[in-house]
Every structure is written in structure tokens, then in C-alpha cells.
Amino acid sequence: MSSPSKPTSPFVDDIEHESGSASNGLSSMSPFDDSFQFEKPSSAHGNIEVAKTGGSVLKRQSKPMKDISTPDLSKVTFDGIDDYSNDNDINDDDELNGKKTEIHEHENEVDDDLHSFQATPMPNTGGFEDVELDNNEGSNNDSQADHKLKRVRFGTRRNKSGRIDINRSKTLKWAKKNFHNAIDEFSTKEDSLENSALQNRSDELRTVYYNLPLPEDMLDEDGLPLAVYPRNKIRTTKYTPLTFFPKNILFQFHNFANIYFLILLILGAFQIFGVTNPGFASVPLIVIVIITAIKDGIEDSRRTVLDLEVNNTRTHILSGVKNENVAVDNVSLWRRFKKANTRALIKIFEYFSENLTAAGREKKLQKKREELRRKRNSRSFGPRGSLDSIGSYRMSADFGRPSLDYENLNQTMSQANRYNDGENLVDRTLQPNPECRFAKDYWKNVKVGDIVRVHNNDEIPADMILLSTSDVDGACYVETKNLDGETNLKVRQSLKCSKIIKSSRDITRTKFWVESEGPHANLYSYQGNFKWQDTQNGNIRNEPVNINNLLLRGCTLRNTKWAMGMVIFTGDDTKIMINAGVTPTKKSRISRELNFSVILNFVLLFILCFTAGIVNGVYYKQKPRSRDYFEFGTIGGSASTNGFVSFWVAVILYQSLVPISLYISVEIIKTAQAIFIYTDVLLYNAKLDYPCTPKSWNISDDLGQIEYIFSDKTGTLTQNVMEFKKCTINGVSYGRAYTEALAGLRKRQGVDVESEGRREKEEIAKDRETMIDELRSMSDNTQFCPEDLTFVSKEIVEDLKGSSGDHQQKCCEHFLLALALCHSVLVEPNKDDPKKLDIKAQSPDESALVSTARQLGYSFVGSSKSGLIVEIQGVQKEFQVLNVLEFNSSRKRMSCIIKIPGSTPKDEPKALLICKGADSVIYSRLDRTQNDATLLEKTALHLEEYATEGLRTLCLAQRELTWSEYERWVKTYDVAAASVTNREEELDKVTDVIERELILLGGTAIEDRLQDGVPDSIALLAEAGIKLWVLTGDKVETAINIGFSCNVLNNDMELLVVKASGEDVEEFGSDPIQVVNNLVTKYLREKFGMSGSEEELKEAKREHGLPQGNFAVIIDGDALKVALNGEEMRRKFLLLCKNCKAVLCCRVSPAQKAAVVKLVKKTLDVMTLAIGDGSNDVAMIQSADVGVGIAGEEGRQAVMCSDYAIGQFRYVTRLVLVHGKWCYKRLAEMIPQFFYKNVIFTLSLFWYGIYNNFDGSYLFEYTYLTFYNLAFTSVPVILLAVLDQDVSDTVSMLVPQLYRVGILRKEWNQTKFLWYMLDGVYQSVICFFFPYLAYHKNMVVTENGLGLDHRYFVGVFVTAIAVTSCNFYVFMEQYRWDWFCGLFICLSLAVFYGWTGIWTSSSSSNEFYKGAARVFAQPAYWAVLFVGVLFCLLPRFTIDCIRKIFYPKDIEIVREMWLRGDFDLYPQGYDPTDPSRPRINEIRPLTDFKEPISLDTHFDGVSHSQETIVTEEIPMSILNGEQGSRKGYRVSTTLERRDQLSPVTTTNNLPRRSMASARGNKLRTSLDRTREEMLANHQLDTRYSVERARASLDLPGINHAETLLSQRSRDR
């Protein structure tokens, strides 16, 4: 019995039918089920029939449908068309080429509304030419609906009669009642994005119908759809022209500082508070608000333009068919008027911009060129335009169907291949709708359930299910660059049942519905079911829909003439919009700590104001000794009232103690810093044409405080450009290479790797030339390209010729054929040479494997309708692919199943499964009886050798199936593939059954080369005090060898291995949790004498130096999962890693990467940086304080989610050590300077209040209060934060130890802030009391006999001393003195004197009139100014001089060396990580430096006494030229020669292992015997076959030969 909760079938006329094909998940309640019956309608229901099923009552329209029984289609023709196999016969565009004149006549008759559109179908055609309609939102189509449907909007209610209910309150209540609060008009765009991004709504299932009425349970009481889908119109803007002013003002006054100053302005507007000029007092706030509004307006205007362009983009929507899934929008006259005005303004703006400016005319011309190019390209692509040039291969018309896109997908194409051509959607018994046509319309008018056709080079307007394409097999190319950043083309496949649809006439003769999961953010997952009624037997048919059948909004159609699809998600439900709001907002550490400084100033402000209120109230109470200074004194009538008013007067008077311009100044500074980073040419990657791009402009100072860097390996430390180097086939190893990891291993053995590497590479080059000649002579390989040959082995060419016997020849052929068949790559003609095919792979590994097979004569040249085309030694063969079982991270393997025909037509065919995957996975699935034991041992030893060289290894295997075995399995597979829920898990279970009992073919080894400058970059970061953790998904041995080659590990380190299981840890128990806990506890106790207590963790948080021990932690994913589980376990694991110099986490998932970053960041309270290049690094990047994305080979998703984007890993050293240190030091000096200068000015007023009972009178003329921060003192401080440099970028890179001051937080802390505040208090005393003592008795008389005792005149003295001392104080604290900064210091002083002279010459200055002439003319003024400034600056200058001479900081020592010219031999911008850097061989030694410096491992950036300074290492070793072996540029903290290890060439030094079982001992004895034989026969390289890192335990996950064999020998 069907479940009543399932959606009902749209078919209502047939009462009894057999059930169709079953599907899991969203099975519809079909009227063809036996349990479905009609009851006799009662009078209460009128003309509605009621259907009962399973106890539920379903309403149905009684109007019967047409008979859907299947006639004899062989006798049925329509419009003279009886052949549906030829695309050219039924394509809209091709059919009407001869009728353009008549169609253009119809186009000219098109009106703005669909009502006026009339067109006549041409005879013998499949539809209509696309007609462009100016279809506004308010347009309705009479052919689409019998009655108008109104879409709910605020203030516009829909109803059947078309009447509009204007009552907005009732409308809102009605909408909430019927749609369960599903109205989103009242929420902001940001909220909707955030909610949709954070919530997984995949369980919100939806059913979308085409050409069918909705079931009654999906309609409301008015017969309108219950489901409300978002419009396809997007709005990323915050404002509209009408709402910009109020919303922007409201947004700005969410800032507490702005609210605070607004309250003060409101208070100042009341005369009782004594503000002299309230209007002038509002100038600073008005300026800040206007500047911010202009900035916001410019930013939002760009978004508005982009929104308009996107929403008004044209696409082709099928018209003439009623879309039952949505209600038609009813647009009110007011909205029509607003939209008409908006369109008119846009048109006017476009007209003037395109016709009155040169840039606009050029843009208009470019648009016309693009349109012509698009139309030309659209006509040029046939059924397989991208493969047309392969016609020289003389393939059939079906040749060229590309493979599917399998990356990160867990879906399949096999179920689509199960349908015959007769099992399709088109019901030829139905008459085509003559009013149905594809018409151009705006993206914003696309709705769920619409049929959309997209042409070549057009973007996809919404997420839609692909129904058909111009290609005969329903495939199309899409570019997903806008979605995930990847530039390689991907293939999407139309549904098998609908690929025959080629025209608007065909689609009108179909009826179907889609059961879909809800919207979610996963770009690589989609599950749904496509259902229709079989025209032959009336059963409900089902075809599963997966991500391969989905075209996502934002993608672009490429190399395909057109594609047709059904819209399933629109607007905010599309995946690109859901992912738009994922990136979190980050705030820098200084910005967070700045709040505490502001609070301290508020406390100080309150104390001053409270004091003023108390004093003034007390004096008011003592009337005989006080005066009523204010008019309110007689009104208040009490001391308490007087004190209360005086408190707020003081708040207004001392408001500058909390600087209003601080926040906007910080924003300006960080913007400038981001611009400098972006324009740094030394961070520009010329190969990618990619500069360092700041995406988060407000965290630049965090770059200078990084203590931990978390890095991915593949694509980050390595290039992710895979090169096939070696392989093992039938126990024979092929290939010769000298890898970087091998060079690092040989270097640890004490070998001169430069000479050995040069010799090896010369021999490899000779073998390569020989191999190329032999390959050319062996066969006519049309795809052979010597430049792409990375696999060098002349032996394999000889074996392919049969020199080692037929058996080895067959093994090599089978191995290479497996490489050519088991993959998911695409091929396209090369643009320069169409006969050559370019490989388009989803991963570099697959590209390397397929490319190597091609070079050896097994070329994959394309796909046919039924399989793959492989050119074998010049002869093309077709292989029918039955199924492809995709790779995913949990399976760690992929397989393909090939059909093998019988030897005779009567023989039953067979199925061959080819599987490739991780060596450990393949070995565990090998058949224990059909594989030769010696062969497995040899292969395992070869794989061990490859992994030791740092190569990535894979294994290939196969299994032969009988046809009956395959048919039984594929039935279960199809059921799993049709499941909507848990489809991935079901598929994994089914594939696990068949991927067993495999026969080993061999193994491959691929090199992922290190990026340029990685070893030097890591060495510099380590010397800077930055700890590097490598978080990778690679196997442990590969990661370790890469770690040694890139300086993460060194030979002096002891590796502390943490793993959850294995024979070596049996003594710790069998429970993984117990094993990991015991291991970590043992290491803490034995190596560091720690127990893992809370007190030890608190002590570790205070320690920021480098670990004293020489240890490294190696942990795999299973052990890491245990280590992150539980507070105690996390604490112990973190303490262990904290005391180690390097940490390698291997086989970790993206979620584990993010968890490790969060653990370190939150627990240790340190600054973290995460760097990666792939989508699996996004979580880690977003979890760190600073996320850096590398624009690499794995797409740009990491770049899009990062805070900074760079081209290579080595650029992070300059980003951190140079720009990070500069930004941190600048901002750390600017902020206390900002508070300091305000304290001087504000406290001068406070001292003045002592002598007037704090009555609130102003010492300064009021304009001084406004311009002091705005013009007199702001520019020097801002220039300090933008341009100051402690040392040059070259010195910063050569002496990375200078960076440690940021890690130790020496430049910015509350102690420094309080010190500046105290200095400001002292200088405020000087600024006020020096002029006061000089003038308080009016001893100075001017020439005209007038005194200078007016408070405004005295205020000129105070202001002049404060402005001059502040600006000179800033100049003194700068490291960089140049004419530019000096110029602005002078200009700031000139502004003060210029304004005073200009303002006092105007009578508007009232009491201040002629003040400048009277004050500046007195010699006493200049004397007081000089003495006041001298006493302000002399104490600080004296203290700084004493400290620098007797207690210098390391930066001051290095600066003296730099200024003396000790680094002059290094060119400007010298980068030790740049491979193309100049070599510095001769450096002038230091012979007259008074005292050597200490820059050893204890360097902390703080001051040292003379007694503690000792001669040691860096940079003295640099300056004395002692860096010959260090390449002349690396700043190293240790120059001692490392102990050289003798090469190990025997097996006696193999690590001892705990073999607890007899099986293990027997296995080891056999393997040792095989190893010795191979060594004797020179089948293993003795240089590194037994090399092992010094480790506490056998390394986890290292696929030693015995490890692989033990996995095989275990019972499954």
C-alpha cells in the first residue's frame, strides 16, 4: 500500500495499471497502484472526484485527460516527419533557415505583452524560430492559463478573480497562515544568504510538474500552488535609490562610536550645555558620515550595475505552455511606474555612456562584436563541434561522445545507458501545441518548471536538469569557472529518456514530473528522480537524476550549439547563490584589543567628567564663594542639578579623549596597506599573470603576528603537476628518475647531490633520446609528442617489442590498455594542430597516466556512443563501456567495466572490470589464489622503493566476470543508483561487492614536484619563529620524504609516531582510543617530562619561543580522529605538538584540517595562517585567522574563499616577513600615537577647568577643537601607519628573526598603550602650565597697551605647543625619515598657522578677532613655544637615547648595520626564495662593528644588555661570507656541519618490528628472501631501498612491502 505522505501522480483518468519500475526514496503515489480507486463523488464535492488511497483522501479534477494508450507508432506521422534519428530534420534553427523572411514578419509584430504575439507554425517543421519578446514582469500570456494567478507580494494578494486586495495587514496575516511564514520580503539579502548557506535544506523535497496539473494536495483553497519558490531575480545590493539615504545612515549608526558622538551633538544643540557653535561642532561627524556614505554608495553602485546586467540578461524560455508550479505575477500600477522609470533612467544612462564617451563607444562596439561572434560560433558547432576535426580518423557519426565528469561525484551514467531508444518521453500520439515556441526573455522571469534553451557561450540562468542538447548523444560541455574557479571544461549528460527532444514541438508532446531534493550548498552532489508514464504499457517509469545531469547557474555552455533543460532551482535556491555567503567575516587582533583601549579612555573620560560635575556642584552650593556661571544656575536651583548639567558639559568638552576619526583612519590605513600588497611586483606570478590579491583588507596587521602556519602539501608545497616516472609490471620495474625527494634522501646520507644529480640527469637524457627513436620506429603513433614524455625507460619499449618474451609483452600491453581505458578524461583538438588531441582531465594524476599510455602507443582519442576509442599502435579500436564506478575519497579507487564480445556470435560475452586505486586498497582486494606470491612481493618492494623516493603510487588490477554475474550485479547497482536518499552509501556498498578477487596488473609512480623556493621559504619561516604544520591527505611515507626535501624535517629530528593500530602498538592495547592516549602520554613523559595537565597547558600558552627539543610528530588520520576527541586527549596532543619543531598530519580529511587549526588557535591563543590550493582546503582556510589561497592546478575555490590569494607558496614568506611585519609595526605605533595626541589636547582643557571651577568654558577657540584631529595632527600619524619601515624588505628577508617581535606581541600591548597615555598626561601639563605661568598675571602688554590674558589667546599658546610637539613626536618615533614625511609635518604646522591667521582676520571670529596678529607678533610667544616643545620631547628623547645606547633592541642593531651599508651588496628587493635571484659570492666582512649581536634561536626582538651580547651565527656569518655551503643567501641559526650518514647498502639495518604472530614471521621470512634475490639481481636500488627515518615506531601508513602483503593476507 502506498504511503499517504508521498506525492500523488498527475495522471487521473486511468484507474488500474500495473506499477512501473521501482525506485527508492521519492516514489510517487501512483493512480496506477492497485490500492488507488475512485469513489463516487458526493454532492458536497460538486464536480470534484475524490480518490482514496491508504486512508487519505485526495482531490482530483474530474476533467479527464486524453487517452494515453500507446498506438502503433509505426503508422503515425506528424507534419511529414517520420524519422526522429536525424537531428537536422527536427532542429528549430536548421529547419527554418529557408523561412527567415516569414519569421521576421512575425518578429516585427511582437508587442511588449505576450497577448499580442501571434505566429503560425511552418509546415514540415519542428517548431518556431526563437522570437525576442520584450516581456516585462507584468506581461501575461492568455495561452498559458485559463485564469490569472497572482503571486503573493507585500500589499498585493492573489485571487482567482484577479481582484487585488489592498489591505496590507490582512494580506500579511493571510500569507503567514497559508505559507507558514514563508515570506522573505521583510528579511535583508544578507540574512537570507547567511541562512541559506548555513542550513542544509536538502531534506526539503520538491516535486515539479511539466505539462501536467498539480495534485490537489499541492494546491491551496483557491487552487493556487502551495509551494512558493524564490524569484530568479537576484539582488546583492544593500540599497536602492530610495532607500540609500535612510538605510545607510541607519547602518552607520549601528557603530557605537557614531552613536556616542551623535548624542553629544544633540546635547550640544541645547544652549544650557554651553556649546558655542553647535553647527560647527557637527562638522567632523558629518564629514565622516559623508565619506563613509560615498564609499558605500560607490561599492553598492557596482553591485547594482552587475545585478542589472545579470537580471536583464536574455535567455530562451518556452512559451505557450502553462507552468502549473508557480503563480503568475500580478504587478501593480505603482510597481509598473517605478520599473518604467528605472528602465528609462538606465536607457538614458546607457545612451549617454555609449555615445558620448570614447570608452562607451568602444564598449558598445565590443558588445556587437561579441554578439556576432556568439552567433557565428553558435552556427559553427554541430552535433559534436569540439570533435569535428577528428574526421580524419574516419570514425562513424556517433564518434566523439565525451566521458562524464567524475571528480567528487558519486553518481553514475550507467543507468541512463539502460534505456532503449523507444523508451523516451515523446508521446507521438499527442498533437504539438502550435503556440509553443522558445522566446527571448529576461533571466529574472525564469521560474521553476520552465523549459529553457541555452545557446553556445551563454551562461546558465538557473539550476536546471539537462533534457537534451544539439549533440546526438545528449552531451554538452560546460565551463564552471564562475562556480568553483576551475577553467577546464566539464561534460554534462542529458537524461537518456529525453535526449531525443530536439524542438519545441517535441517538448510539448511530453508529460513528466521531477522529484528533487531540496537546495543545498554542495556543488558536487544532487539527487532526484525523473518520472513519466510509459506510452507503451502505462507504467510509471523512473530515471535517476544526478549532478552529471544538472546545469548549474553561473556555468557557461561551451562547444555545444544548444542545450535544453527544465528549471529546478531559481534565485537564492541555486547553488551559486547559496555558496555566496559562506566566507566568514574576520577581524584583526589589534582591532579586537582596541576595544579595551577605548573602554579605558571611556573610564578616564567618566572620571574627568564626574570630577568636573562634583567640583562645580560643590562650588555652586557655596554661594558666597561662587558665581552663577550659566543662565541655568538660577533655573536649576540646586547643587545636584548644577553638577548633573556640568557633568554633561564636561562630556561634550572632553569628547576628543575618544577620537571620532580613529576608526575611519584605521580603515584608510588598512586600505592603503592592501593596495601596497596588491601592487608589489615581487609578489606577482608572471606565469599565471596573478598578483597577490588581498580579499580581506582589514586583517593586514595579523600577517605580522603569525606563529603557526598550516599548509597543505599537494599543490601547495608541491606543484600539483604530475609526471609519470616509474611503473612496475609483472614484477619488473621500469623507469629512471632523479627526484627531489631522492636528492633530499641522498643528501641526508652525506652524498654530494649536486654532482650525483648532474650525472644522473645526463644519463636520463641519453636514455630519453634512445627511447624516442625506438618509439618512432615501433609504430605510427599519431598522438606521439616527445615534448610531453616524462617516463624514461628504453626497457619497456624493448619489452613491448617482445624482447623479454611473449608473456612480458602481453603483461605490458594489458597494463597500458588498462591505463587508456580506466579514466575519466576528455580529449579536444589542439587549437594549433587539430590532428593532435589535448587531454582535459579532472585531476593531474589521471592526465599523467593517460598521457604516458599515449606516448607508448595506447592513445585514448575519444568516445563513441557506446564506449571509448583507443588507438593501439596506430590502429583504432572501440571498447564498449558498461559502467564507470567513480573515484571518491572513501573508496580510494575507481573502476570501469568493459564488455568483451564472445569469440563467436553465439558465445556469451564477458565483462572485464579494471580497477585502479591506492596500493593498500588494491592489495587488500586481490584474490589470494590467482595471484603469484612472488610477483606480489616484487611489486610490493618496487612500490616501497617508489614511495621512498617521494613518488605517489597507484596499483592497477582487473577481474573477469561472466555475463550472468554482471547482469545479476547490475540489477542491484541500478536500484542503488535510482535511490534518492543515501544514494552514495548504497552505491559504495554495491561497488564494494564487485571490486573483489582482483588480479594484479602492476603499479605506477608519479612525481609531484616541489614548488620553486619551497625549501628556502620554510627555512626562513622557521628562523622567524613560525611553526609549520603540514596537513595532507597523502600517505605518510610520501609526506615524510617531501618533508625532508623541503626542510620541514631534518636528519637530526626524532620522529614521534602516533597511530591508532598496528603490530608495533599492540603493547598499548587494542582499543584505538587507548592506544593513542597511551602513546601520547608516553611521549610527553619520556621526551618532555610532562603529564598533560591544565597547568602545563597554561604555561605553554605563555611560551612563544621555539621548542628546545629536536622532535617531530607524525600522525595519521585515524589517530588524529582519536586525538581530537575529548578535552583531555586534545590537551595532551596539543602539548606534544607544541614541544615539537614539526608536525605532519597525514591522511586527514578537510574537516580534520579545520579542527586542527581551531584547536591550536583557540586553545593556545595564537595567530594562525592556513594556506592551500584546493577545495579540500577551504574549511582550513576559513578557520584560520588568515587564510591564503594559491591559484594552482586544482581550481580557484580556495582562492575565492581566502583572505589573500598568491601564485606560489614562496610568496607567503614575503607576504608575512615583509608586509606583515611592516603593517603590524605601523598600526601598532599609530594607534597609541592617536590616543596620545588627544590626551594632550583634552587634558589641557581639564587643567584649565581647575581655575574656573569646571564651569565648561573653552580654553581654545572652538574651531581648534574641530580641526585639531581633522587637519592639524592627523596626516603625520596616517603617513606613519602607511609609509614607515623599520628596515628594508631585503633586510627583512635576510634577517627573518626580526619577525619574532610580532609573535611575542612586543609592538602592541596595553602596557605600551598606558605608557603613551602617561606621556600624554605629562606633556599636557607642559602645554597648559607653561603659557599659564607666563600670562596668568597679565605681565605681557602689547604695543597698543592691550594684554594677552584672554583665554582664546592663551589657547593659541597651548594649541601651538600641543600641535608642534605631537607632530615632532610622531616624526621622532618613525624609523623612516625622508623628505616626504618631513614635508607633511611642515604642512600640518602651516595649516595651523594659516588657519589661525585667516580665521582671526574675519570679524566672524568675534572674540578671537585679530588674535593671530596680537599673539604671533610677541617674541614671548616664540620663546614659550620653543621651551614648551623642548620640555615635552626632551624626556622621551633622552630615555630613547639611553635605551638605544646601553640596552639596544635587535632591530636597532640590525638597522645600524643596514644604515652602515653592510647589506648593500644585496640588490633592492632581494628574495632568498626566488630561484632566479642573483648569487652573492663576495660580502665585505664586518671589522669595525663595536659589538657583535645576538640573533640566535633565543632571539626575541627585545632589548639586550651589553653583557648578554655575544658573537654568534647570524647575521655575522652572512656578513663574513661563511655561507658557501648555504648558497650565500639563507639566514640560518645553525651553521655547524651536520653529521653525515654513511650510505646503507645492506639489509642488516632494517628497523626491528614487533611481529607478534606466526603469520607475520612467515611473511617476513619470505619477503626478506625475495628482497635479497632482487638486490642480488640489481632489481632494487641499494641507495635507498632500506633507508628509514629515525622514528619512535614504524611509521603509520607507510606501505612497506610487508605492510601491503599483510593486508592481502588478512581474511576479508
Curated annotation (Swiss-Prot):
Record text on activity regulation: Phosphatidylcholine flippase activity is inhibited by glucosylsphingosine, lactosylsphingosine, lysophosphatidylcholine and to a lesser degree sphingosine-1-phosphate and lysosphingomyelin. Glucosylceramide flippase activity is inhibited by lysophosphatidylcholine, glucosylsphingosine and to a lesser degree lactosylsphingosine whereas lysosphingomyelin has a stimulatory effect at low concentrations.
UniProt effect for mutating residue 1592 to D: No apparent gain of activity
Gene Ontology CC: one annotated term: plasma membrane
GO biological process: ceramide translocation; endocytosis; establishment or maintenance of cell polarity; phospholipid translocation; protein transport
Low complexity biased stretches: 20-30
Positions of Mg(2+) binding: 712, 714, 1173, 1177
Extent of Basic and acidic residues compositional bias: 364-373
Listed name of the protein: Phospholipid-transporting ATPase DNF2
Quaternary structure (record): Component of a flippase complex consisting of DNF1 and LEM3. Interacts with LEM3; the interaction is direct.
Modified residues (Phosphothreonine): 70, 782
Organism: Saccharomyces cerevisiae (strain ATCC 204508 / S288c)
Binding site residues for ATP: 712-714, 846, 887, 889, 892, 916, 952-953, 1032-1034, 1147, 1153, 1176-1177
Modified sites of kind Phosphoserine: 85, 389, 392, 396, 403, 1542, 1592
